[in-house]
Amino acid sequence: MDFIRAIILGIIEGITEWLPISSTGHLIIADEFIRLNQSAAFKEMFDVVIQLGAILSVVVLYFHKLNPFNKLNPADKQKTPREIQLTWRLWLKVLIAALPAAIIGLPLNDWLDKHFYHFVPVAFMLIIYGVAFIVIERRWVPNHEFSVMDIDRLPYRAALYIGLFQVLSLLPGTSRSGATIVGALLIGVSREVAAEFTFFLGIPVMFGASFIKILHFFKNGNSLNLEQFGVLLVACLVAFGVSMIAIKFLTDYVKKHDFTFFGKYRIVLGIVLLIYAAFKAFLG
């Protein structure tokens, strides 16, 4: 039964990791109705490590763009020295953007999980950023031209600003992609570049978060049995496959549409969650 639940959770992760609607928020919601029959320690680790499947989809889809070494894949189109230089610069921008979340998130990770990993905080963050998306798209973007239309022209300073916005996503329900896209739009980065840079920024952030959770899991004396390994593997594989579709969808979507729809979705979901939380509290 846990393998079926793992498939469902993998689908949820694959869809919500890249759309600006909060994968963590959706997994918290899913846990209320689709609970794995596993220990609390495993479930805590599962919710983070499942992201590895999602992030591997970015590596596969954008391998040529992200790979600075021609010899890694001789069958791939060879890069010019200029293209290799741009790839190294892109990685430097990604690392610069990842630093704020690493510096601030590491010491606060356990405290944030303890105090904000619940329905009500998630609901409020869904609503707040939903409103932010709508206001930015309707009030800010129409009055400001995009100054960055190509990811290779993204300034290092802009990468740092986007990284600072990513810190806000440490609060469950915010959405890592949502926070970075909001920040990117506010500093004049086009929707396409904002989405693409968000994909790349997820690589060090999510690999790092997964490594820390795995380390924490074993450091606390837990062990991973064969069934748990299988559940985790199935969820990651499903998240990988679904993420491939979600990334393609979002890259095509932002070429013709803005993020208003996602803002409305977040607000509706947040309100439904608050009603559910109130109803649950009333029933005791």
Swiss-Prot record:
Localization in the cell: Cell membrane
Catalytic reactions on record: di-trans,octa-cis-undecaprenyl diphosphate + H2O = di-trans,octa-cis-undecaprenyl phosphate + phosphate + H(+)
Keyword terms: Antibiotic resistance, Cell membrane, Cell shape, Cell wall biogenesis/degradation, Hydrolase, Membrane, Peptidoglycan synthesis, Transmembrane, Transmembrane helix
Cellular component terms (Gene Ontology): plasma membrane
Pfam families registered for this protein in UniProt: BacA
Record-linked InterPro entries: UppP
GO biological process, one term: cell wall organization
Enzyme class, broadest EC rank: hydrolase
PANTHER family: UNDECAPRENYL-DIPHOSPHATASE
Role this protein plays: Catalyzes the dephosphorylation of undecaprenyl diphosphate (UPP). Confers resistance to bacitracin.
Family: Belongs to the UppP family.
Additional record remark: Bacitracin is thought to be involved in the inhibition of peptidoglycan synthesis by sequestering undecaprenyl diphosphate, thereby reducing the pool of lipid carrier available.
Protein name in the entry: Undecaprenyl-diphosphatase
Species of the source: Lactococcus lactis subsp. cremoris (strain SK11)
Gene behind the chain: uppP
